[in-house]
């Protein structure tokens, strides 16, 4: 297997005329996220699961310039640790795998079809406001805002309503991305209905059953975070 990967690099896995193919979707999404200010300076990442394959954007590449041939492909399931045991079936030889990989795998192990990691300024700001106002162990909470309806209640439970309170757990940042994995897993266990985890002074991980749901949930959350920051400036409470 290793010799075959080295010989052909399984390029056929990222070659498709289908615009919905993960190798085509990931570059398109990364360009959008770059234009929205979510993934500046090569930060952030995106991964999509299709069947028993996981497609992941590379590390260290300007997100607006990613091309299908830059995409890594993993077999799924695959070990998270050690990195050397991960079952890559396509590795662009000149690029490094994403440091987000074990965190993406954590979402996929819980049934996600797509996981997005952004460095949104609004996400970072709300983690700082929550820490200052409520302490380091508090989660982000907001209610009575229409856009909350864009976030699921939990697997198979429908969507949140206007009068519901949205809660997003917050974990502390670490010096290295992969070291966030344990905290992410713990937050997912403590908040089993969540589809997102904020990382203080860093950004957010958002996942969904498929690409469209992950993207729209990420958009809804970013809207809510920006609104929360502006509400705080005006002295308006996030929860009524």
Curated annotation (Swiss-Prot):
Entry's cofactor comment: Binds 1 zinc ion per subunit.
Domain of life: Eukaryota
Binding site for substrate: 100
Top-level enzyme category: lyase
UniProt feature, compositional bias: Basic and acidic residues: 1-10
Cross-referenced InterPro entries: Aldolase_II/adducin_N (IPR001303), Aldolase_II/adducin_N_sf (IPR036409), MethylthioRu-1-P_deHdtase_MtnB (IPR017714), Salvage_MtnB_euk (IPR027514)
GO molecular function, one term: methylthioribulose 1-phosphate dehydratase activity
The protein's Enzyme Commission number: 4.2.1.109
Residue ranges of the region described as Disordered: 1-20
UniProt entry keywords in alphabetical sequence: Amino-acid biosynthesis, Cytoplasm, Lyase, Metal-binding, Methionine biosynthesis, Zinc
Requisite cofactors: Zn(2+)
Residues binding Zn(2+), per UniProt: 117, 119, 202
Example of a GO biological process term: L-methionine salvage from methylthioadenosine
Reaction equations catalysed: 5-(methylsulfanyl)-D-ribulose 1-phosphate = 5-methylsulfanyl-2,3-dioxopentyl phosphate + H2O
Gene Ontology CC: cytoplasm
Any one Pfam family match given in the protein's UniProt record, by short name: Aldolase_II
Record has Metal-binding as a keyword: yes
Keyword flag Membrane: no
Annotated localization: Cytoplasm
Ranges in coiled-coil conformation: none
Job description of the protein: Catalyzes the dehydration of methylthioribulose-1-phosphate (MTRu-1-P) into 2,3-diketo-5-methylthiopentyl-1-phosphate (DK-MTP-1-P).
Entry's family note: Belongs to the aldolase class II family. MtnB subfamily.
Protein name, as recorded: Methylthioribulose-1-phosphate dehydratase
Species, as recorded: Aspergillus fumigatus (strain ATCC MYA-4609 / CBS 101355 / FGSC A1100 / Af293)
Source organism phylogeny: Eukaryota, Fungi, Dikarya, Ascomycota, Pezizomycotina
Name of the coding gene: mde1
């Amino acid at each position: 297997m290793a010799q075959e990967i080295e010989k052909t690099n399984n390029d056929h896995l990222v070659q498709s005329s289908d615009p919905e193919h993960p190798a085509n979707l990931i570059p398109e999404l990364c360009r959008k996220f770059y234009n929205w200010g979510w993934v500046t300076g090569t930060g952030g990442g995106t991964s999509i699961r299709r069947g028993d394959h996981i497609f992941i954007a590379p590390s260290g590449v300007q997100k607006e310039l990613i091309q299908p041939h830059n995409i890594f492909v993993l077999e799924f399931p695959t070990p998270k640790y050690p990195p050397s045991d991960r079952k890559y079936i396509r590795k662009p030889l000149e690029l490094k795998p994403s440091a987000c990989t074990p965190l993406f795998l954590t979402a996929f192990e819980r049934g996600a079809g797509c996981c997005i990691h952004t460095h949104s300024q609004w996400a970072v700001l709300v983690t700082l406001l929550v820490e200052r106002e409520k302490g380091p162990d508090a989660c982000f909470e907001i209610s009575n805002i229409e856009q909350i309806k864009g976030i699921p209640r939990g697997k198979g439970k429908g969507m949140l309503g206007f009068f519901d309170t949205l809660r997003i757990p917050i974990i502390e940042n670490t010096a290295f991305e992969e070291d966030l994995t344990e905290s992410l897993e713990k937050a997912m266990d403590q908040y089993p209905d969540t589809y997102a985890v904020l990382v203080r002074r860093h950004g957010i991980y958002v996942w969904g059953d498929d690409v469209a749901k992950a993207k729209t949930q990420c958009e809804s959350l970013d809207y809510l975070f920006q609104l929360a920051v502006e509400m705080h400036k005006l002295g308006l409470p996030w929860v009524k």
